[in-house]
Amino acid sequence: LRILKLFGHEDVKKVISTSGAEQEYFLVEKSLYDQRPDLVLCSRTLFGAKSPKGQEMDDHYYGAISPRVSYFMRDLDTELWQLGVFAKTEHKEVAPGQYELAPVFADSNTATDHNQLVMEIMKKTALRHGMVCLLHEKPFAGLNGSGKHNNWSLSTDTGMNLLAPGKSPKDNLQFLLFLAAI
């Protein structure tokens, strides 16, 4: 707080840690999932041939989302909104059948709780749509895995992000100071 006061921010009363965990996941047809004991028991493939299709096609990341997955995402959003978890973005990811949900950031404690809710609600919602949501970090050999990117920062109670670069040299000095201190 003393450093912020040196930069002229007299109104700041506290600094908090904020976070937003981008959750990647795979959606698999339930009937196909049920035929794979390794997926059922371990949430990943342990035997069998590698995927015949990798990331070389154009049906990932910027590809269109199928209507079925769109309905899943809509229902997921509705359920999460009712719990106070707001998704900022949802899109396809690099591997076939892989997607990502990025919630709006919150204080780190709340964001951690939100991520637990997101994972639980994803699984339940997928089942209602005849799919299984796989959250294992590497469910399929030879394909990108599912990561969890954590967008972490420090913010003030007045809404200032201390890890956002400034627009002027003076404002950038504050950013560089906090970045170096971390």
Kindly label every feature range from the protein language model.
Residues 1-135, 140-182:
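Glycine-rich, acidic/polar active-site loops that bind/position phosphate-bearing ligands
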